UniProtKB/Swiss-Prot annotation:
Gene3D superfamilies: Cytochrome b-c1 complex subunit 9 (1.20.5.260). One of its GO terms (biological process) is mitochondrial electron transport, ubiquinol to cytochrome c. Component of the ubiquinol-cytochrome c oxidoreductase, a multisubunit transmembrane complex that is part of the mitochondrial electron transport chain which drives oxidative phosphorylation. It is found in: Mitochondrion inner membrane. Residues 42-59 are mitochondrial intermembrane. The chain crosses the membrane at residues 16-41. This is Cytochrome b-c1 complex subunit 9, mitochondrial. It holds the Pfam family UCR_UQCRX_QCR9. Keywords: Electron transport, Membrane, Mitochondrion, Mitochondrion inner membrane, Respiratory chain, Transmembrane, Transmembrane helix, Transport. Belongs to the UQCR10/QCR9 family. GO terms for cellular component: mitochondrial inner membrane; respiratory chain complex III. It comes from Neurospora crassa (strain ATCC 24698 / 74-OR23-1A / CBS 708.71 / DSM 1257 / FGSC 987). Component of the ubiquinol-cytochrome c oxidoreductase (cytochrome b-c1 complex, complex III, CIII), a multisubunit enzyme composed of 10 subunits. The complex is composed of 3 respiratory subunits cytochrome b (cob), cytochrome c1 (cyt-1) and Rieske protein (fes-1), 2 core protein subunits pep and ucr-1, and 5 low-molecular weight protein subunits qcr6, qcr7, qcr8, qcr9 and probably NCU16844/qcr10. Its main location: mitochondrion.
Length: 59
């Protein structure tokens, strides 16, 4: 615990950086997770699922 304190919490700049890095990592994980939930709930109703019915194949 002492090493964690000396590495992150003792210096305000390092602490703020750790908070921002943690928030960024959480945002990425949350966003990806919610996208997967949304895609699962709306499977077959999104443009990416029905595009092949309306767009002709490119040559």
């Amino acid at each position: 615990m002492s090493a964690l304190y000396n590495l992150i919490f003792r210096n305000n700049t390092a602490f703020v950086g750790a908070v921002f890095a943690g928030a960024f990592a959480f945002e990425l994980a949350y966003d990806n997770g919610m996208d997967k939930v949304w895609d699962k709930i709306n499977k077959g109703r999104q443009w990416k699922d029905i595009r092949h019915k309306y767009v002709e194949a490119e040559e």
